[in-house]
A protein has these predicted regions:
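Short secondary-structure boundary/hinge segments and terminal tails
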Residues: 21, 70, 118, 152-153
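Acidic, divalent-metal-coordinating active-site segment for phosphoryl/phosphodiester hydrolysis
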Residues: 11, 147-161
């Protein structure tokens, strides 16, 4: 067990303002970079869908979709024992915390997590902090981009490229090993698994290109890290 790469599509950017997760994608990646499994589902957010032009999900798509509470047990089991990985992980972690709290569960502090966006500065990605730009730097195909399932799979392939590229770099094998070891000892809330059927997004549907994808063709790559990278990623979610 090693990594659970996650992507959320949401009704907005601030869980404190009652924005909710409307789609989950999870891809498992092993220590050696092998991709072991993929899961995804639309979710009924129990509110309006927010900016549908961003996530591309229609009201008809979620009529018989489960709620987060319906699948929280199965989702937590997919995360258990694995490092939580996402592109702009701080964004997804905030929503994970908020959604878990709505079920009456609380995450223990110090959830082991990695951010493929932040890590990119170590692998020649530079300021291309969007997922599509980072994947482009490694020739990773993003078929049907902007669905949670495909974005999680794309980020998983990006993580695999990082793992392979750093296998012989001084200090990096220990870095990955320590993250994986921490995850093995971390406990997610143990929630009842309800056995509710997951509902993937209909095949062939995706959201439009993001603002940065439409406007960054041929843009130079400057080094952007930390808070700057997170700000740009947040801006990208707003400017569609």
């Amino acid at each position: 067990m090693a990594y659970a790469v996650v992507d959320f599509e949401t009704t907005g950017i601030l869980p404190a303002y009652h924005h909710r997760v409307v789609e989950i994608g999870v891809t498992h990646v092993e220590d050696d970079g092998t991709i072991r499994g993929r899961w995804e589902t639309l979710l009924n957010p129990e509110r309006d869908l927010g900016p549908q032009h961003i996530h591309g999900i229609r009201a008809a798509d979620i009529l018989d979709a489960p709620t987060f509470a319906d699948i929280a047990g199965e989702f937590a089991a997919l995360l258990q024992g694995r490092v939580f990985v996402a592109h702009n992980a701080s964004f997804d972690m905030r929503f994970l915390q908020a959604e878990m709290e709505r079920t009456g569960a609380w995450l223990n502090g110090g959830t082991p997590s990695l951010c493929t966006m932040t890590l990119g500065s170590n692998f020649g990605v530079g300021g291309a902090c969007s997922l599509v730009s980072a994947c482009g730097a490694f020739s990773i195909d993003r078929h049907l981009a902007h669905s949670a399932g495909y974005d999680a799979f794309a980020a998983a392939q990006l993580l695999r490229a990082y793992l392979g590229g750093s296998a012989t770099w001084p200090g990096w094998p220990d870095y990955w090993r320590q993250a994986s070891d921490a995850a093995r000892h971390y406990r997610y809330p143990e929630l009842a698994q309800r056995g509710v059927t997951w509902k993937p997004r209909p095949q062939g549907t995706s959201a439009p290109q993001s603002f940065l994808e439409r406007s960054s063709t041929g843009a130079s790559r400057e080094t952007v890290t930390g808070a700057e990278a997170q700000y740009i990623a947040l801006l990208d979610r707003c400017l569609l």
